[in-house]
Amino acid sequence: MKHVLTFTALILTASGSALAADNFYGAVRINSANYKAHDMDSSARPGLGQFVPGDDSHRATGGSLALGYQLPSDWRLEAEYTLPRSNEFTSGSTRFPTSFNHHSIRSQRLMINAYKDFPLNAQFSVYGTAGLGLAHLQSSGWQGNPNRQYFSDSQNNLAYALGFGVSYSPIQKVSIDLGYRYVGMGKTHSGANNFTNVRGLQDEQMRAKLSSSEISVGLRYSF
């Protein structure tokens, strides 16, 4: 993730010399997100019976920082970094119904987003947005009690985002955004169990596919 951030910063710096300086903007956003862990039934718990669902969603507040450029015809292009956020999800099995897996997934993203603005008047506009980028996911957790830990693991996945919203510009150079977007962050898994299970094997692993539905409020300032 550090290398990707550095590479993106270099691209933006290099491109800045060829673009009009007064078309750049910076943005700060706060979001309320519902994180969802899909496909937890793909977790490896051999010989432990059928999958038992637990908590597969978690609501959390987070934030992001963005640097963008205003293009002709009401298009915008930006690089956005979403700050790290950890969420915990649970699942179990019929043979050990009280020994739940507690799957902690720490996520952060670096996205390139495109926006199309549709002005309604001098101050209000609506927009649609789509983005592609990188999601860095780290999985860890435990089973039954915190002493029964899994090894941690991490993945870098292709992430995508789709959304819409409304913008209000109270004064020149300042815009306030209210928006919704769906973000798919791909699959993640922990390492194997770092504890002795009933078979005396390291053959268990927590797995999930992570997404989020986000409502955000943002402040944009044009340079």
Residue ranges and their predicted role:
Residues 1-23:
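Cleavable N-terminal export/targeting peptides
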Residues 38-46, 88-96, 138-148, 189-196:
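Outer-membrane beta-barrel translocator domains and adjoining extracellular loop/strand segments
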Residues 21-23, 30-34, 65-142, 168, ...:
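Gram-negative (and chloroplast) outer-membrane scaffold detector with strong preference
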Residues 55-61, 104-109, 120, 152-159, ...:
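Short sequence motifs at beta-strands and strand-loop junctions characteristic
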Residues 157-168:
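Transmembrane beta-barrel strand/turn architecture of Gram-negative outer membrane proteins
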Residues 48-54, 95-103, 145-152, 201-207:
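Extracellular loop and loop/strand-boundary signature of outer-membrane beta-barrel proteins
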Residues 32-63, 151-157:
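Surface-exposed strand-loop-strand hairpins of Gram-negative outer-membrane beta-barrel proteins
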Residues 86, 90, 170-223:
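Predominantly the C-terminal beta-signal and adjacent terminal strand-loop region
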